[in-house]
Structures are given as C-alpha cells and as structure tokens.
Amino acid sequence: MAPAGGKNVKKGILERLNSGEVIIGDGGFVFALEKRGYVKAGPWTPEAAVEHPEAVRQLHREFLRAGSNVMQTFTFYASEDKLENRGNYVAEKISGQKVNEAACDIARQVADEGDALVAGGVSQTPSYLSCKSETEVKKVFQQQLEVFVKKNVDFLIAEYFEHVEEAVWAVEALKASGKPVAATMCIGPEGDLHSVTPGECAVRLVKAGASIVGVNCHFDPTISLQTVKLMKEGLEAAGLKAHLMSQPLAYHTPDCGKQGFIDLPEFPFGLEPRVATRWDIQKYAREAYNLGVRYIGGCCGFEPYHIRAIAEELAPERGFLPLASEKHGSWGSGLDMHTKPWIRARARKEYWENLQIASGRPYNPSMSKPDAWGVTKGTAELMQQKEATTEQQLRELFEKQKFKSAQ
C-alpha cells in the first residue's frame, strides 16, 4: 500500500520526475463540490475554501487515499478579477487573499498526511478575455503568487488556458518565484483558440520557463492524449525537453468542437451519461504512461475512484497500491463475495474490459451537435464586467441561441 507521511523532507516535483517516478494528480474539484452543494455553477469560484473548509479538506483526503501525490490548491478561478466578475462579489465579501490562503492551508494539511506535494494553481482570467494588457494580466497572477510564496507551496501550476499567449504570461509571472512551474492548456488537437498548434504551444511554454507541459480539462482522455502527443512531437522537433502532464475530463467527448465540452449542449448539468468508467480510466493511465507522460491525473468529472484506477493500473511501476485499494478488488475480483451467482461471474477482468456500456436511454442520441459560437478573446460577448449580467443581455443571448439552434 501507499507509503505513509513522515517527518523526512519530501522530494520535490522535478526530483521525482527526473528519477522516473510516476506522479498522480488529483481530480475535478469544482464539479465534485458543485454536486455536493458547495460550489455555484456559473462562476465556478472556490470560496468554499473559506465557507466550507471541511468539504474541501475531505475531498483532498479522498484523492490522497485514492493515490494522488499532489494536492493542488483549490484556487481555480481564484483571481481577484474572477471573484468580482458578473455579480460575483466574493472579492468584496471575503477577499481573494483569504480564499487563496485558506486553500493553501487546507492542501498543506492534507499533503502532510501522506507523501504528497502542494501545487499552487492559477488559471485563465477575465482580464485577458477583456483585452487587458500583459502588465495588467500578470499583476492578477502576481496577486495569487504572493500568497503561494508566503504559504511555501512546493511548485506551481498554470492550468486551464485557452490561449497560449495568456499561458505564457502566467508561466513568466510564476517563474519569478524560483519554484518549478507546470503549464497545461485546455486545448485539443486543433490547438488554442487563436489556432496556435499544440506543438507550438508546448514550445512557447517551455521557452517561457515551464518544466512540465501538457493539457487539462475540456476534452476526454483519448483526445487529450492525442494533443499531448502533438506537444511531445513539437518539443522534440524544437530540440527542447520537458516532462509531460495530462489531466483530462472524465467525460467522453468525441463529438465536441474546438472549445471542448463547454460547447456541448449537455454542459454542465447533463453530462452524467458521458462519465468514464473506472476501466476507461485504467486504459487511459496505461496509454498515457506508454506515451511517456509521467504526471497523470484528471480534471472535471474525475472522482476519487477514477484516480484510484490510475494508481491501480500503474501500481507495478510505482511499487505500491493506494490505501483506497483496501476496499477494491482488482478488476472486480471482490464480486466473488456477492450473494448472486451471476454477479459472482463478473469477478474477472475479461468481463469488465470487454463490456459495451448501455446508457439506459433508448430514445436519446449517442452524440450531440456542439453549439460552436466561435467566440474568443476580443469578441464583444466575451468582454467581462463587474456588474451582474442584465436581463437585456440574457434576452439577446437567448435569441442568438435560438438562431444558432435553427441553423
């Protein structure tokens, strides 16, 4: 089973990766906590770190028990400009500093219960979408960075960027701390929203100072690994080296467009039929490892049992199973204890590996048509505002949606 925490100094993220160790990330906090009633869909901001620290702490612990050895601070969308965007007054009522500090404290507490590191994370900003300057956008990142340095996180992650330009600015801002920086973009094989290829994105991120590059969110494991492969090829062609990282969705998205699952009509409240099984994730973990990815985790939709699947699949390489495997038989082997004989007959790898999963929805399509509005930085509808969205603005969007649906 997984090694317990101790008083010894932990190896850093680059020391671990350079030695060939497999790093297992955590899963999707905002989706998991929204379902549990602690995060509001829409703004997706992390004030739960202050308002409900016990919920955030418990989710960290479940990921740790499942095999994660990185506790990523719950600071997704915790920039000051996001916390006061479109009627979200968290910055005014609580303050961005308190949210970021609380998230760091919780992550450190849980990380020290095991052999885990703490990663401070920043993500894309309303300031960039509103065409603010490089200096202004970097200042937003620097506000969070000040907290991460004060709380002495082990390394930093710039994640969930749709535009490589902003991701580069984030990496440059974070690199000033002297701590290792990882950078992941929420892009598919077509590249970022300005059509910069995945290979070129990776090159720019490494040149900006990132030691670890890859993708997170927006796309399923299969598509995400296709993108990581393109990043790897781009780095090799440029003669650059970096560790590879993958933290995809736990939803199947073969029908999504360039912006990924946020274009799907089911986003965010109808995605459950698309959830990946634990066996899907074991397959993803093996394919990621074979591609050369050594930082393997998940994003939205990834629950602790998905992370456990990664840890179990890669247990031979890591040398141990996670603590959560104490209550989980490999490939369903624990089903041999079931009272019903047909269930006991499912206690084998061959059954679950080859099962074609039914949705139970006989009149529903298996694929959707993405909305594909095609908006990006500078588009009027993406210009952000401090005030809440008005009724008139909503009516205009409703009419546009009707028009798009009729096309």
Swiss-Prot record:
Binds 1 zinc ion per subunit. Keywords: Cytoplasm, Metal-binding, Methyltransferase, Nucleus, Phosphoprotein, Transferase, Zinc. The modification Phosphoserine is found at S330. Its EC number is 2.1.1.5. GO terms for molecular function: betaine-homocysteine S-methyltransferase activity; zinc ion binding. Involved in the regulation of homocysteine metabolism. Converts betaine and homocysteine to dimethylglycine and methionine, respectively. This reaction is also required for the irreversible oxidation of choline. This is Betaine--homocysteine S-methyltransferase 1. The gene is BHMT.
